[in-house]
Amino acid sequence: MATVSGRRRKRKIQLSKLFTLTGAKACFKPDHSKIGRSGFSRVVFCNQPDSPEAESRNYCDNYVRTTKYTLATFLPKSLFEQFRRVANFYFLVVGILSFTPLAPYTAVSAIVPLTFVILATMFKEGVEDWRRKQQDIEVNNRKVRVHRGNGNFDLREWKTLRVGDILKVEKNEFFPADLVLLSSSYEDAVCYVETMNLDGETNLKLKQGLEVTLSLREELNFRDFEAFIKCEDPNANLYSFVGTMDLKGEKYPLSPQQLLLRGSKLRNTDYIYGVVIFTGPDTKVVQNSTDPPSKRSMIERKMDKIIYLMFLMVFSLAFFGSVLFGIWTRDDFQNGVMERWYLKPDDSSIFFDPKRAPMAAIYHFLTALMLNSYFIPISLYVSIEIVKVLQSIFINQDIHMYYEEADKPAHARTSNLNEELGQVGTILSDKTGTLTCNSMEFIKCSIAGTAYGRGVTEVEMAMDKRKGSALVNQSNGNSTEDAVAAEPAVKGFNFRDERIMDGNWVTETHADVIQKFFQLLAVCHTVIPEVDEDTGKISYEAESPDEAAFVIAARELGFEFFTRTQTTISVRELDLVTGERVERLYSVLNVLEFSSSKKRMSVIVQDQDGKLLLLCKGADSVMFERLSESGRKYEKETRDHVNEYADAGLRTLILAYRELDENEYEVFTERISEAKNSVSADREALIDEVTEKIEKNLVLLGATAVEDKLQNGVPDCINKLAQAGIKIWVLTGDKMETAINIGFACSLLRRDMKQIIINLETPEIQQLEKSGEKDAIAALKENVLHQITSGKAQLKASGGNAKAFALIIDGKSLAYALEEDMKGIFLELAIGCASVICCRSSPKQKALVTRLVKTGSGQTTLAIGDGANDVGMLQEADIGVGISGVEGMQAVMSSDIAIAQFRYLERLLLVHGHWCYRRISKMICYFFYKNITFGFTLFLYEAYTSFSATPAYNDWYLSLYSVFFTSLPVICLGIFDQDVSAPFCLKFPVLYQEGVQNLLFSWRRILSWMFHGFCSAIIIFFLCKTSLESQAFNHEGKTAGRDILGGTMYTCVVWVVSLQMVLTISYFTLIQHVVVWGSVVIWYLFLMVYGSLPIRMSTDAYMVFLEALAPAPSYWITTLFVVLSTMMPYFIFSAIQMRFFPMSHGTVQLLRYEDQCSNSGNFEMGRQGSVRPTLVMRSHQPES
């Protein structure tokens, strides 16, 4: 009877799903209540895309466009983008006004600089969009085989595909649209899919078509094929799909198991047939391609405020001048005669009419706005964009951040945040795969209450060092360092214990439990074996490194998983009775997948004896409560071992199983099928509810312990970042004991730190939590508040010495701490500690903590992670850094900057961050300095001429100042300048605090640069005016006019701003010499060439240099005297600052030049908490 029923059951589950639960059958009554309603209204006419019903649906075509512009929209849309910037819009208004009689200069000279800047930016946008267009053309013109009718398949371009088309996709081809899988080259319609382009995961996914479409394996089979698919509307969820297929009058449920997404690739399968259900913009990959969160750096936001301040100043000066002009114009008419007779207006002009002084003042206000526009640096935005792009290239090309082993360089995915890298105050880091390698090694296990495995972990080594002892590796007598440094012979397996290796487990007291333990490891997984055709060796494609480590461990200990079909798993193992190796076949009935909410996975299998087994593995927090009363025999010993493993920094899982009777399984099958057939958005919740009822009453087998080793250089990197004054938070899903010990191993925690631990894991609290009553929840919250308050009291009692404290909090406590009424006090405590570790954190909690730190502390936050569960945290932080590690590329694709190893963060921040912050800060300050120096000389000259709105300079002098004579040096400053070299940045991390405290872009520093510009303009104007106004300019006795005074002042301005650039630059390259001195040379060449043009073109600059300025000694003497006088205040200020108020970089520069840096003891940098890091020159300290 058992045999008959077993056969019946085998036939029934012949095509059950591997990655989902048991396949649904048409014999069950499905719930189609949602189909046809909002969100579930799509109807696909399979193999009938030309039918009137299909065409009436008006589904979009399959052309995918990633460009920002089209040919028709490029000009208006790009112009709109440019003139959204207030500065550009202001210059546009000024350009329009320059065509009116109000303009103090010609319209062409006003339009040319704006046109140059706008065209340069549009050119950059156009080139970038053209590259995207070329990529679009390449993708849309790819070809795929499409059913044309009568069983014939022809090649067609992707862009021509329509909903309902039947496609044949062959091995290693990408899917051109979202398809429902019908059949494949395998008899059971299985295919393997690589989804790296979607979620970054490199492991293969297994998909399978419905049983009813298995026979469609030949092209001719589609000649008469017709079906209807009703499914959900287009959406961005990659991991869900709800629909039904109506075929021959029967309805069959569709799930993600049948969905093949555009952008994924067919692997290890000769071909598949599928029907198009979503095209072009409706495909899930395009639905997911939304713009990432817009992030702007702190400096960029502050720069906008400076622009508004400059506008206020421009309007104030224009208003001030207009009022005075109106008063002087009104008072100009005395006794019927105009005092300034030469300004007498004609009948058509009121600009200087004393009888209409108010109107003249209003017109003058508009004229003054145009004249004062030179205070605003027109090329600021485009120059910064150019600089940031080139800075990003330098980051990408840094050989010191290139990970040769994986061939992965650093990649700045956006250039908007370069300077933000130099201002990070808090780093929030994931642990697994970020601080650690995410390359798991099976190192210990507990079976039947007995601990196995004699290896020594990195955490144990760190504990030894803290205790000052020398632990010896028990397995071979080597020292701890040797044990950790030794590479395992088999990747993923670092287990040493002769009691169960080499088949010795059969002699152990609990050999039967050991056998079940490793059988579970060999069977309970979703791993795909791959056989090398040349060597015959088996490798494993696993969804996670843990899974691979378990399968490898089972193989190395005698239980080799070697073959998987859709419905079976084959294992070679040692028979406990005969002692011989045998092959055992397990029929896979169901796979209950792992999820972060369940924290476990199970498989239901049938062994060769006909037994139904549920094999389960999961976190201890959920597994122990699911044990039956009779299955807790080894619970106490296993709990103790799990705690010991956690103390050693190991990741643990509990293994358990149970036998199912046939009736129970039949009930489960019926209920799970009903849940699967529920075509609604909450289908997954219904499935979880059913699986919850069968994953219970388990029998404990033991626990696994795998080690995730720290990446190279992590402790040194963290120590260096801490010396730079950066606080580091670790947000991990690990147990508290594991997280604490990893913290010690990576130098996040130190022996002299006092740990403030907040948790809700005590037995009393757990008992209270189980009651679930409102009073109990309130008590839990009150307990967390009490622990936080107590921690703050400890911190206060220590005098606020953050260096002495570390905060460790578990996930349950964190949930309460992040509530609105408690997060403020929690943040105060956390900020007061040097290090923070959040354990058992969910992805949502990681994002919420990041948001709390970013908004609550006011500091720049950087989040770093490597997995999909870190995406929210990366997007929430000011800067998201993705680690291109083992868990795929999803974190990288959501990040702002990608690096291959955590240790590269040290160079990214302390070198590139520091340099970029200094460069951008100095660049912006210098921009405003040079424009104020130039613009204020115009204002002073206008005031000198009774606000007559006459510019001191020729029109083209005005136009070319910002975009030609002074732009290249400041761009080179932003690209090449270094206050100290990279080795010194790393040697003296205190330099980084200049960015964290924003010393170089504070309002004090900005206003001081502006004041310096005003002073320079005043000195230039008055010295030039005084030197030239009351004496003959040359030997012919000619006095200086506007052309000579303007030319002389302009020369002085060019020299002064160029020399100021020389004094601002800390690190000269040949390029900088060329552009700085070349700017001065080009000014003189321009004077000669432009002045030599016909007078109708050169106007008042005609021959001014060759005939007036160059032959006159007074011009050269005045220029020399004025330039030196203008630079003298800056020399004096710099000398005083260097001598009495040196900044950190100045001190390092001084020591470098004095050759004192050869001795590392000259500087002492200690790890700091919340206080500012201090730089101590030991050589300058008096000896005691």
From Swiss-Prot:
One of its GO terms (molecular function) is ATP hydrolysis activity. Mg(2+) binds at residues 866, 870. It is found in: Membrane. Its main location: membrane. The keyword Metal-binding applies. Residues 98-101, 329-364, 942-955, 1029-1041, 1092-1108 are extracellular. One of its GO terms (biological process) is phospholipid transport. Pfam families: Cation_ATPase, PhoLip_ATPase_C, PhoLip_ATPase_N. Residues 1-75, 125-306, 383-921, 976-1005, 1065-1070, 1134-1184 are cytoplasmic. It catalyses: ATP + H2O + phospholipidSide 1 = ADP + phosphate + phospholipidSide 2. Involved in transport of phospholipids. Belongs to the cation transport ATPase (P-type) (TC 3.A.3) family. Type IV subfamily. This is Probable phospholipid-transporting ATPase 12. The gene is ALA12.
